[in-house]
Amino acid sequence: MINISFPDGSVKQFEKNITAFEIAVVISTSLAKAAMIAEINGDLKDLSTQIDNDCRLRILTAKDPECLEVIRHDAAHLTAEAVKELFPETQVTIGPAIENGYYYDFARDKPFTTDDLAVIEAKMHELAKKNEKVTRELWDREKAVEFFKSIGEHYKAEIIASIPSNEPISLYRQGNFIDLCRGPHAPSTGFVKHFKLMKVAGAYWRGDSRNEVLQRIYGTAWATKEQLESYLFMLEEAEKRDHRKLGKELDLFHFQEEAQGMVFWHDKGWSVYNTIEQYIRRKIRKNGYIEVKTPVLVDKSLWELSGHWEKFRDDMFALETDDKTLALKPMNCPCHVQIFKQGIKSYRDLPLRMSEFGLCHRNEASGALHGLMRVRSLVQDDAHIFCAEEQITDETVSFCKLLTEVYKDFGFTDIKVKFSDRPEVRAGSSETWDKAENALKEAVEKAGYSYTLNPGEGAFYGPKLEFVLTDAIGRQWQCGTLQMDFVLPERLDASYVAASGEKKRPVMLHRAILGSLERFIGILIEEYAGRFPLWLAPVQVAIATITSDLNDYALEVQKALIESGVRVDINISPDKINYKIREFSNQKVPMIAVIGKQEKENKQVTIRRLGTTEQEVLSIEQLIEYIREENSK
């Protein structure tokens, strides 16, 4: 007999070699009917898994979050089965679950069309309704290779050759379809009910541009109909808010082939950019930061010393000149250490908070570029805090408070924190890591945040915090970071004189609130759906005249607003007032100042706010004062 421990703390005895499904039947028929997979000693397994030792067991259903990835993996197999039935000449390759869905790569001469996707999806529903049994089989390696070659599945045969010899070759069979897979999978295709095929894209075999291009079908799958509908609605909203589309419509920026991954900022977009930079500059000055500027092009010898050349060489732009190799900096940290090293530093100089809006370049693959979200040329609100070990907690608390304040000003209040602790391969002693991790945990808690743990995901040189924002349609964006570094000060020989007179290495805290300004602006465009708040809007007030005889007064109003630092647009053309208002509304200007005969006589304007029908009559002084207060962030 074996002892099975259940989540409620109970322990029951069963005969050896009983399956997880058979145990589910003993517990209740309803559980057995809903059961998808088993968690045995923390590992996810098929329900058909035989248990011959004492263990901890959870029977999981679609209600359990662990099953969502299984549902998506099952949907990938269902997609492949449908494709093979409809297009038998197609070769299947790989089909993993990914965030919010899955994909499956196919080798086929003729491209899949949108109509093909609809047919494939219909076939998937048909196969799911058949509720085909899914079974796991272990095969001899040579037999598996020969089998896949015999049915023309040469990619599968190649995959088997790359599987370590000590790993079993497991296949899953459903209906007439058989696929190479580690699993686990649900016991039948009927568990995959709520899915949709999304698009087709090209993908290199094994992600290598030297290999052939495959066709990748993307799909999404969820545990419930409501979850699927919610996700599709979110995608619909995201499409409406796409910063690339709005960037063009609102005349903010553009990209072109001659400078891939580099932004052409138009005047309105550059206004938003500069407003954000000036806002951050005011915040960090109030918080005791100095601002510096370091070279964009630096000799590779510094990058070799810092370790970046070894780790990031492929992502750096380099050029040869005067028998030297120079590289465009991908980050600012080594240059900041050079400034720290100028002159003798004392413990009295610490903490030293050094910031820079540093222009960085990263050689991102062209296929990874995505509007403002992924670029090759970027500016970060980057800063490095050089401090003593005993100052880590206070500096982290201070940073968390600043970050919270900044995010709130931009309208983000749902902030999640991820804490990444020591990886297996790391620099520094266990004692140093203990101190660092405890200091960060204490600081996060003092700042009023809870956190989720990412075990082993810290960098080799120190633990880190990641700050994740949730936007208006529920998407999450990782923006802020705080990274502790014991290694770079050592590598670049940075030191300070302690109170005892001995030389010590400072701890270096790499920190950013927005991250890349380009990416953060992309996030803001989508968060606001292009409707920037008044203080951030590229045009804060648009002036529109009802008749041409009011133009002189309109120009007076424009002059007064500009002299007060207000960003203004004006339309004094003969066009009808409704047309002018509609045009400014389409440009998402937050305030439209309408000028008629009465407004001119009273030295006033009638304000219409974007998205409302309400109107408010203000004097020019009142309007300027209101905007001044909004701009004071």
Swiss-Prot record:
The cofactor note from the UniProt entry for this protein is: Binds 1 zinc ion per subunit.
Task: Supply the alphabetized keyword list.
Answer: Aminoacyl-tRNA synthetase, ATP-binding, Cytoplasm, Ligase, Metal-binding, Nucleotide-binding, Protein biosynthesis, RNA-binding, tRNA-binding, Zinc
Compartment(s) of residence: Cytoplasm
rRNA-binding as a keyword of this entry, yes or no, is: no
Q: Supply the EC number(s).
A: 6.1.1.3
**SUPFAM superfamilies membership:** Class II aaRS ABD-related, Class II aaRS and biotin synthetases, TGS-like, ThrRS/AlaRS common domain
Per UniProt, the enzyme's principal EC class comes to ligase
Quickly give the catalysed reaction: tRNA(Thr) + L-threonine + ATP = L-threonyl-tRNA(Thr) + AMP + diphosphate + H(+)
Report if keyword Hydrolase is assigned. Answer: no
Which cofactors are required for activity?
Zn(2+)
Entry's family note: Belongs to the class-II aminoacyl-tRNA synthetase family.
Q: What does this protein do?
A: Catalyzes the attachment of threonine to tRNA(Thr) in a two-step reaction: L-threonine is first activated by ATP to form Thr-AMP and then transferred to the acceptor end of tRNA(Thr). Also edits incorrectly charged L-seryl-tRNA(Thr).
Name the HAMAP family for this protein: Thr_tRNA_synth (MF_00184)
Q: What is this protein called?
A: Threonine--tRNA ligase
| Annotated source species | Rickettsia bellii (strain OSU 85-389)
The gene from which this protein is expressed is: thrS
